[in-house]
Amino acid sequence: MQCAAVQKPLTNQWQTLIDTIYRQYQIYHQSGGKEQVVFNTQTGQAAGRSLTLLRKLTEPLALSASGRMLDVGCGNGALLAAMGNLYPQWRLTGTEPNDQHRQAIESLPGVEAFHTGEAHQTPGQFDLVTLIHVLEHIPHPAVFLRSLSAKLQPAGQLLIEVPDHQRNPFDLLIADHSTHFSPAVLRRVIRQAGLQVKLLERTLIPKELTAAAVLPVQSLPHHDDLTSLSPADALQDVTRHINWLRRFADEARAHARHDPVGVFGTSIAGTWLGATLGDGVAYFVDEDTSRHERPFMGKPVLAPTDRAARQAKVILALPHWLATQVATRLQDTGIEWILPPAPESV
């Protein structure tokens, strides 16, 4: 697509890999099906991602007390459950490519329907259509968004949540993410879909972009800030991120060369670093208590407060800016933290 987006090469080999991944995929495997939590970077207080997002969007979205919502790619129903909790008078619908979680979703309070198949074929129109970590899986995101615009009521809103690859280079490592978004690219994709950007934030959920879009009949200020966005800029951006990932891997190997290390995190970045270091990993450390119940990559998962977590130096598998915040917040645990390399200056 002509929007200077970073995308995977959409080859037959890539599609075969993706088909294999989706056949074997288990949602939120490490936490036993529980949605990942979001931690307050200052206090460490944890809350579910969906509930956190909806609470932070209360004022920007200004939703009515009642309405209809369509959650596209609803997974096992985390966002639907949070919506039913905060807005009990709303009628909720979910869609998925298959009916693996049909029973769980249909049992949620407020859910009136669950559909499989193409999202744009879902009957009816809605006051809110949500795409939470869906758009990055779509090879042609503008076309996909345009197909969903017909599902919006005239005053309806489309809510999008995607990874921010500029703030989180680890997003580039995820095989089934076909499109990698920056704020400028997401804004352009929304406009190419014939929609207007009502909201675009990168601070509501760490490492993620949050956008709200509406039909163009609504009067909103136009922010034409895309004149400098070019394929050359995108290539330079992604090259810098890949070089950073390589430096991180090299530094981590050096730390683990003589003595095993701990790895903070059991999500994508932790998985990548664990695979990079192999037997150089002694254990993983994670603040999410739901991830302590089972080993990860054959190694125990410890809480930062566990005495055993102090036995080795622990590498923070996070972007540098977030790793510094976490290390500061957890400095009283007694763990010797190893920060990732600082990013190259632009």
Functional labels for PLM-detected ranges:
Residues V143-Q157:
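A short glycine-rich, Lys/Arg-flanked "PGG" loop and its adjoining helix->strand segment in the class I
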Residues L159-V189:
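Short, glycine-/aromatic-enriched active-site segment of Class I SAM-dependent methyltransferases
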Residues M1-G124, L128, I132, L145, ...:
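Conserved N-terminal segment of class I S-adenosyl-L-methionine
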Residues L195-P206:
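Conserved S-adenosyl-L-methionine
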Residues L158-L159, V197:
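A short hydrophobic/small-residue beta-strand
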